Amino acid sequence: MKFYITTPIYYVNSEPHIGSAYTTIVADIIARYKRFMGYDVFFLTGTDEHGQKVLQAAQQAGKDPQEFCDELAEKFKRLWKELKITNDYFIRTTDEMHMKTVQEFVAKMKENGDVYKGIYKGWYCVPCETFWNEDEVIKEGEERFCPECKRPVKWVEEENYFFRLSKYRDSLLKYYEEHPDFVEPDFRRNEMLKILEGGLKDLSITRTTFKWGVPMKDDPEHVIYVWVDALINYISAIGYGWNDEMFNKWWPADLHLIGKEINRFHSIIWPAMLMSVGLPLPKKVFAHGWLTVNGQKISKSLGNAIDPRFFVKRYGNDVVRYYLIRDIMFGKDGDFSEERLVHRLNSDLANDYGNLLHRITAMIKKYFNGRLPSPSAQEGFDSWLKERFFETKDAYHELMDSYRLTEALDKIWEFIADVNKYFNDTKPWILGKEGNMERLGTVLYNSLEAVFKVALMTLPVMPDTSEEVFRRVSFEEKPSKEHLENWGVLKPGSTVIHGEPLFKKIDAKDFKKVVETVSAEQNAITIDDFSKVDLRIAKVLEAEKVPNSRKLLRLIIDLGTEKRQIVAGIAEHYRPEELVGKLIVVVANLKPAKLMGIESQGMLLAAKSGDTLRLLTVDGEITPGAKVS
């Protein structure tokens, strides 16, 4: 049995955050589960390193794009290692093997009559690397915004190669009808069906305005569209075009795991590309929801990107993994909350699970000198516990096989509650006091066997914790499905280690300290970082509204040695006449940018709370151009 699972490859315009870690952790859990069940698994992840957005990020960092990509790819690799991700391969789209595969794949599409040259006229979102038609963008007066990221799009007119995507609309609809489980969850499938039923337009698949990408094989002035380049990673990594035996073993993929915002690329464009070259389609695309912070999508531009390493350092890798899966229903949007994480740690892990093991091993140490007792004649309550285990085990397999990970953990914790009930209701402490060692031994054996089963079922989610449980019960074999299928795996007479509690609870005072420390560490910058920002006092000489914009004002400011123009989104908070004569704080060494076609030569500073915005100013007269330090 084989199982090929992929994550999206992550864009290297910025460092990894908790959102990208979430997808990769989910994939790792599924991969670990499949290995546990006896599958031969290939788990692929990697980085998407071409495109205009990466080029711009490299330029802003003052680095060569390859050097920039090398550094960020290493950061992703290091993070996955810290999170104990068990991927089998890490692909980079700048790999020579991948780039050659992309060229050959697109050449084959062209040979099959599905690629032609034309003129593209339309909107383009650089942050999303996505083309949009006029009827798809968000309109605010003369401004146009990306329907996905809500940032401004730019009008593009250039000679491109196009993919005949429209040709495959009917074939895709038929495939969706014949394979109702192709895209999950159902509501994501319905979104894709709605797009297909509305008709498809041919897709521009090359760019000529920059060179950071894979050149067309027979027309190197054209760089292949970054999304076409990226999607092909799923087959280039497993041998397409260079290792037929490997490719035939693993393709088609069993599961493409993605975020909902890139569903259209994976569930419409990618299948059409595969149809074009005659390859089978992946078995399933699962589009999960967004991980949000305070209700907002995680984004570097919003300043709410969370570095998962801080939480792993504070709470442990297994705690973070457990929280993300248990608290966020897989497939739907979920909000990351450190307070909820601590609640799950204290309640689910420390109280329900860890304390149960601690109580059992303490009694084995006290009454049986740390040796696992032999079970004897079974009573009704013993049979009930076993029945509950087998019911849980069967439900666990069904839920894990259908990627209902949150529900699988719910079932396990229902069983933990059952084990706690069994332990409490059989009252082993009374059995010990009464000297009923035979019955006590049976209760403690069954209780520890049940906790061992919990460790087996949670092994994909909390590998370190499960390994620690195995160590404490002297289980030295490689864990497998067979150990979960049968009751009575633990060997009587084996050493049972009592040890420290599996999880350390966090009280309210400690939680406050952790939050303050983590916040300080995540936001900390060096004095060298701060010194790079040139903050100056400027005097506003003129102010006016930008035509056709309800948000923007154009300011002429005096910086002492020169006058500059700044465009700022403060029109909803200040009238132009209110600003003239004010002394404000500006970033003077910011790279100029165009807003609504007007060049902004700096950025003013303001504070915002809810709907209130106020400019940063000074409490008295000072010469324009004075440096803020």
UniProtKB/Swiss-Prot annotation:
Keywords noted in UniProt: Aminoacyl-tRNA synthetase, ATP-binding, Cytoplasm, Ligase, Metal-binding, Nucleotide-binding, Protein biosynthesis, RNA-binding, tRNA-binding, Zinc
Motif, 'HIGH' region: chain positions: 10-20
Record note on cofactor: Binds 1 zinc ion per subunit.
Domain tRNA-binding residue range list: 529-629
InterPro entries reported for this sequence: Anticodon_Met, M/V/L/I-tRNA-synth_anticd-bd, Met-tRNA-synth_bsu_C, Met-tRNA_synth, Met-tRNA_synth_2, Methionyl/Leucyl_tRNA_Synth, MetRS_core, NA-bd_OB-fold
Residue numbers binding Zn(2+): C125, C128, C146, C149
Subcellular location: Cytoplasm
GO biological process: methionyl-tRNA aminoacylation
Reaction(s) this enzyme catalyzes, per UniProt: tRNA(Met) + L-methionine + ATP = L-methionyl-tRNA(Met) + AMP + diphosphate
Enzyme Commission numbers on file: 6.1.1.10
Cellular component, GO, one term: cytoplasm
Sequence positions that bind ATP: K300
Domain of life: Bacteria
Enzyme class: ligase
Family the entry assigns: Belongs to the class-I aminoacyl-tRNA synthetase family. MetG type 2A subfamily.
Name of protein: Methionine--tRNA ligase
Organism name: Thermotoga maritima (strain ATCC 43589 / DSM 3109 / JCM 10099 / NBRC 100826 / MSB8)
Species classification: Bacteria, Thermotogati, Thermotogota, Thermotogae, Thermotogales
Gene: metG
